[in-house]
């Protein structure tokens, strides 16, 4: 059976091999694992529906289109959350729809990508999720919506691993290269983009190779003390 790997797993291993062992080999989960965000889920579903179901016969949808979609995903929200979400969508509309000449139908919305990699006679099943995949002139842009109240950019080495994993998976799935990974912070209307290169793919292959070696040799998963110990312990 293939060994499951994801961006979160790679980032955990990079931070601390022993934390990886505790969480994924021994099944010990942190309290944060059980968190849930109904408002964030509703926003993601609304934007997925808005881009998926828009007819694209006109250059741009009206704001009412987003609100119609929003109304279909608010049943589990409080009135305050529903109003908060409406304001967030208004910010999104002004920054990412009304400011464009036209919007184009994405390759896909709110989906999963899967790929495989063979290392040291071990098969790794690579899995990831995305909010939207857009076409670029020379490849693909993967868009990830963030509904957190604070803008917290990922560390450079961790975003590099995420980019590399998606690069590898999208190349297998669509035969196209990832050129850009973009984070859209819904509450502020800010977009942060990272270029994707073949070097990111090579980085992920190297890290997966290290995991394969540890699994094969059954050697100690060395701890890497740091700030992650507070949340992983």
Model-identified regions with their sequence ranges:
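RecB-family 4Fe-4S metal-dependent nuclease core
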Residues: 1-233
